[in-house]
Amino acid sequence: MIRLGSLAGYAFEGPRVLAGWTPPARPGVYAILYKPEPDTKADKYAVIYVSHADDLSTERFPFSHPRASCWIRRAGDRFKLYVCFLEVPGGLRSHRELITHELIAVYHPGCNSDQYDPAWKDQWIGEYTAPTAGPLTTDRDPSTGP
């Protein structure tokens, strides 16, 4: 098991060597990984691609996938690639898409053509202030106790 996402919120199965993996015939989110420093940091992985599928067995794994050449180029060898996957219990396609977008925003995987920015911009809904979001209006000093 490997945890991915903001605050490592998703428990993915794997990582497993991609060359020997038989994907399940189920929907899921998957990430392609490699070890950037296998000799010194064998337990550290880098995320190079994230996607989702309605049926993981139809994604043309391991090396007929449309982005496989990018994966191999990044890892240096097809046998240095790893895969991990997440089945979203009760999750719809829209849930898998949201998880995929979040992971792409967090890791910025180089083999994904689409990238997402998790930043918030005031112009999206307008700037606002609320009295509950401001500083406390009491003259009591919290460091002195009750």
Model-found features: residue ranges?
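Boundary/linker segments flanking structured domains
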Residues: 1-146
